[in-house]
Amino acid sequence: MCELYSKQETLALRRKHIGPSCKVFFAADPIKIVRAQRQYMFDEKGDQYLDCINNVAHVGHCHPEVVKAAQKQMELLNTNSRFLHDNIVEYAKRLSATLPDRLSVCYFTNSGSEANDLALRLARQFRGHQDVITLDHAYHGHLSSLIEISPYKFQKGKDVKKEFVHVAPAPDTYRGKYREDHVDPASAYADEVKKIIDEAHNSGRKIAAFIAESMQSCGGQIIPPAGYFQKVAEYVRGAGGVFIADEVQVGFGRVGKHFWSFQMFGEDFVPDIVTMGKPMGNGHPMACVVTTKEIAEAFSASGMEYFNTYGGNPVSSAVGLAVLDVIKNEDLQGNATRVGNYLTELLNKQKTKHTLIGDIRGVGLFIGIDLVKDHQQRTPATAEAQHIIYKMKEKRVLLSADGPHRNVLKIKPPMCFTEEDAKFMVEQLDGILTGLEEATGAETESGISKNTPCRTKMPKEAQSELLRDSSLESRENPSQKRNGLCTDSLLSKRLRT
């Protein structure tokens, strides 16, 4: 399709007709993307960008097998799921086969938000309880029911935490309440959940569910310590609640060895409800809730029929089947393991070289780089992170920054990401970090101790901009600056190199 408008015309029309809260990546200088293929995106000038952040185009942008499956089915039939059709049952059968046996009943929706909203309904109907335990910094969707259980959202806005919502500390062993030097961080964090349950019961409240991403994404690429989920599930089920695993961002083989991220934590841990979305349709809007027969029967016993007009329609199911085929036929799980390990190795070498890198954490092709101003206090390097993602864009590499302090570089590329891509990305990052550290006077020798503060002496100009950014932090709307959505005001304040 030919372009209808110039980049500036497109931007002007967007500002006029699209809600101002709907942000674009790199808002101060957005990229106009006109096509994409595999792990590469192309702007209106034909410039190629390496996509390191798009976990929606899971098997690669515009994968020919996925496109062909959608086109073929659209030529035959697309209608709602009240009609009997093979695609939905075939997809449900194959999807269930990737999960533990007890997770066998599917409800198809169109987005992760719809899936998580339905999961809450299932949980509340199961025992008749209402309260929900969520993790600090969590994000589970944009519906009102999910904003209420997403501290990532309601803590940044004017909303007040609802009485039925209980927030447990995120199991972050790098900068959380219990860190890597704790004798048993898994038990310590799980005991925080138990305290919440006990306090709720003492107040006459009952827990319906504990919900968590198997690995927190918006929370800063957090991987819970081994054993944490098992203990939490024990406490929650003992209170009559269910465990909801949100796999919307981290499922479908992204971690490599396992198809679902929750499977990393052992065969003795099986959630009661699993939600999935983003990568499921490789850009086609589809999502799902999978649960046990017992929970599904309790939901049906309410007498209220569940119907979703587009959920599980023939075209969506055909797309979903094609995505499963590509993951298997192209060994994308194996690729996630191999390339993820290689990328992590390269990044750990950078960690010994650059004092701005405080922590590298991740599994497969889900990796976070926690940037810090000093290693002893682990002070988040927020402005530096924003500076880096813009500089990476100039090098034609797309990254974003997130986490509660927006200082964690997020890496979650399409699953066809290669070792050559990983090497190129790290080379660009190395050059930018080197330039930034030279400009700020930071040492970059590999012999620096992890526990030694980086006593950086920044140029007056850069230092004043960082101070100004810090002073405005509490006054500016944080929602305008997350996910790499750097606003004009923030861009004007980023470090100059």
Curated annotation (Swiss-Prot):
BP terms from Gene Ontology: cellular response to glucocorticoid stimulus; ceramide phosphoethanolamine catabolic process; lipid homeostasis; phospholipid transfer to membrane; response to food
Stretch list, region Disordered: 440-497
N6-(pyridoxal phosphate)lysine modified-residue sites: K278
Keywords, ordered alphabetically: Lyase, Mitochondrion, Pyridoxal phosphate
Keyword Lyase: yes
Cofactor entry: pyridoxal 5'-phosphate
Enzyme Commission no: 4.2.3.2
Cited function: Catalyzes the pyridoxal-phosphate-dependent breakdown of phosphoethanolamine, converting it to ammonia, inorganic phosphate and acetaldehyde.
Protein name per its UniProtKB record: Ethanolamine-phosphate phospho-lyase
